[in-house]
Amino acid sequence: MPPYRSRTTTHGRNMAGARGLWRATGMKDEDFGKPIIAVVNSFTQFVPGHVHLKDLGQLVAREIESAGGVAKEFNTIAVDDGIAMGHDGMLYSLPSRELIADSVEYMVNAHCADAMVCISNCDKITPGMLMAALRLNIPVVFVSGGPMEAGKVVWEDSVKKLDLVDAMVAAADDHYTDEQVKAIERSACPTCGSCSGMFTANSMNCLTEALGLSLPGNGSTLATHADRKRLFVEAGHLIVDLARRYYEQDDESVLPRSIATFSAFENAMTLDIAMGGSTNTVLHLLAAAQEAEIDFTMADIDRLSRRVPVLCKVAPAVSSVHMEDVHHAGGIMGILGQLDNAGLLTTSIPTVHSETLAKALDHWDVTRTNSEMVHKFYSAAPGGVPTQVAFSQERRFDKVDTDREKGVIRSKEHAFSQDGGLAVLYGNLAEDGCIVKTAGVDDSILKFSGPARIFESQDSAVLGILNGKIKPGDIVLIRYEGPRGGPGMQEMLYPTSYLKSKGLGKACALITDGRFSGGSSGLSIGHVSPEAAEGGTIGLVREGDIIDIDIPNRKIHLAVDDATVAERRAEQDAAGWKPAEERKRKISTALKAYAAMATSAARGAVRKLPD
C-alpha cells in the first residue's frame, strides 16, 4: 500500500522541526498519522463568483476534521474575466490558469498533502485546479461556488431575464437611453456566483460532473440556494473516505487519472457539445488531458461534434434560459441521462461518488428516479433578492421540469439540432483547426462568405465596429491575439457584443486566433491554429480577401490561390511575423515568459519548454 504522503513531514525523529511547525498550526499528537487534506480555496473580493467563498473553505475543513482528517486551507489567485475584459488586463487571464495549476502543485507537494478538495468557480480557476489535480494524481473532490441567479428587469410591461452580456450590448446600442443602460447594469448580476448563463465558468463546473470529479448538482445548483451547502459538507466527508481507500486499502480507482480517463474526457466533451458550452472548454479540456497524459485531441472533438445533438440551449444562445432553468430541468445529470439514452456515453466508468456513472444516473436523473430527495433537490429556485451571501434562500419550484420534448433539456428525438453545439473547422486558413460555438449561430449564416476586414488587435477592431467601418456581409478578422501573439489569447467579448449592438450579429462573421468569452454568440470563429505569431495563414490574409465558411461541412477556406499565399508567406518570413501596426500594449516580463513557452490553441495553449 502507498504510504501517506504526509508521513514525510510528520514521522521520524528527524522531522521534529517539521512537527513543531505543524503543532504551531494547531495540530496535536493524535493528528499525526491522519490524512492531511489540502482545502484549495479561491476566495477573493474581486470576483462575484468567489466573493462568497471565504467561509466555505472552513466549512469544508470542519467536515474533513469531523470525518477524521486534518484540513489545511490555502488560496489561489482568481481573475474576473468580465472586469479584465476590454483592456490589457485580459492578457493575464489565460496565463493565470497556468499560475493556478502551478501554485496548487507547489503548495501540495511542498507540504506533502495527501488529498485535496478544490473550491473553484470562475473561468480559469476550475481549469487550473483541474490541471493540477491530474498532474498530482492524488484523491480530489471538486466543489464550486455555484452559478449566479439571472438578473431580471421590468421591460415594456414584462419581466425580462438578464445577464452580463445584456449590459455590455446595451451600453454600445444608441437605442438605449442612459437610464435604461443603468437599469440593466444594476440588474444584470444580482447575486454572488458565476455569471448566470452557459458561459465558461458554468460550462467547466458542469464538465467536472461529467468527468466524475464532483458531486451531482455541482454545475447547476445556485450559489444562493441552501441546497448547495450539502455539496460542501459531503465533499469534506467524501475526500477523507477517498484518501483512506487509496492509502489504507491500496484502491487506485479513486485517483483522478483512474476516474478522468479517455472515456471520461469523451463524456465531458459530449456533454459540452450537447449543452452548447463555451468554446474555452476546448482549450481547457485539451490542457487537462495533457496533464493526465491522455491523448485527447482536436480530432476527437471533431469526431464527437459530428454525432452529438444539441439537447439544451442556454444563454447566450437564448436569452430566456439560464443555469437556474437547467437545474430546474434536472441539471447535468438530466442532460447526461438523455445522452445515455441515445447511446452517446460510456457509463461503466467510476466517479468520486458512485461505483459507475450508470449507477449515478439511475439515482440522480429525474426522468429515471422517483426519489423525493432528488426531485426536491432539482426544484431549487432563485430567491430573487440581491445578495453576496451563500446558501441564503430556500425557494423552490412546484415541480421539476421533466418535459424532454419541449422543455429546457430535450431528448435526442426532440433535439434543438441534430448537429452539435460546437464544431471544429479545418481548411487552408486553419490547418490545425479552429472552433465555433454552433449553438449560438443563426441557421441563416451556417454558410457564409465575405470580404475580410483586417485588424491587428482587438482594440482596433472595437474602434472599427463602433465607428461604423463594418458593413453587413463583412468578416471581421482579428489576428496576433493568440497565446503567443497577444500574448495571452484575449477573449473577444466586446467585439461580438458590439456587432450585436450595431445590428450586425446575424449579418457578419468574426474570425480570430484569439478566443471568445463564454458569453459570445453569433458566427464567432476562434482558436485559429496555427496563430499568426507562429506563421499561420491567418497572418497572410489581406484586406478584402474572400473567406468561405461552411459549418455543416466543417470547412473554412481563404479564397486565394496557393501561389499567391506562398508569395505572401515568403514576404512575411522576411519581414517577421508581427502586427503590421504598432500596438500600445505593455508586455511585462511575466507575459513574455508565458509567450516564450505557450503552445497553440490546438494543444490547449499549455506551456512547453524549449527542446
From Swiss-Prot:
It holds the Pfam family ILVD_EDD_N. The keyword Nucleotide-binding does not apply. Mg(2+) binds at residues 81, 123-124, 491. The modification N6-carboxylysine is found at residue 124. It catalyses: (2R)-2,3-dihydroxy-3-methylbutanoate = 3-methyl-2-oxobutanoate + H2O; (2R,3R)-2,3-dihydroxy-3-methylpentanoate = (S)-3-methyl-2-oxopentanoate + H2O. Signal peptide: none annotated. Gene3D superfamilies: IlvD/EDD C-terminal domain-like. Pathway: Amino-acid biosynthesis; L-isoleucine biosynthesis; L-isoleucine from 2-oxobutanoate: step 3/4; Amino-acid biosynthesis; L-valine biosynthesis; L-valine from pyruvate: step 3/4. Its cofactor is [2Fe-2S] cluster; Mg(2+). Binds 1 [2Fe-2S] cluster per subunit. This cluster acts as a Lewis acid cofactor. The active site is at 517 (proton acceptor). It is an enzyme of class 4 (lyase). GO terms for molecular function: 2 iron, 2 sulfur cluster binding; dihydroxy-acid dehydratase activity; magnesium ion binding. GO terms for cellular component: cytosol. Keywords: 2Fe-2S, Amino-acid biosynthesis, Branched-chain amino acid biosynthesis, Iron, Iron-sulfur, Lyase, Magnesium, Metal-binding. SUPFAM superfamilies: IlvD/EDD N-terminal domain-like, LeuD/IlvD-like. [2Fe-2S] cluster binds at residues 122, 195. GO terms for biological process: isoleucine biosynthetic process; L-valine biosynthetic process. The keyword Metal-binding applies. Its EC number is 4.2.1.9. Homodimer. Belongs to the IlvD/Edd family. Functions in the biosynthesis of branched-chain amino acids. Catalyzes the dehydration of (2R,3R)-2,3-dihydroxy-3-methylpentanoate (2,3-dihydroxy-3-methylvalerate) into 2-oxo-3-methylpentanoate (2-oxo-3-methylvalerate) and of (2R)-2,3-dihydroxy-3-methylbutanoate (2,3-dihydroxyisovalerate) into 2-oxo-3-methylbutanoate (2-oxoisovalerate), the penultimate precursor to L-isoleucine and L-valine, respectively. NCBIfam families: ilvD (TIGR00110), PRK12448.1 (NF009103). This is Dihydroxy-acid dehydratase.
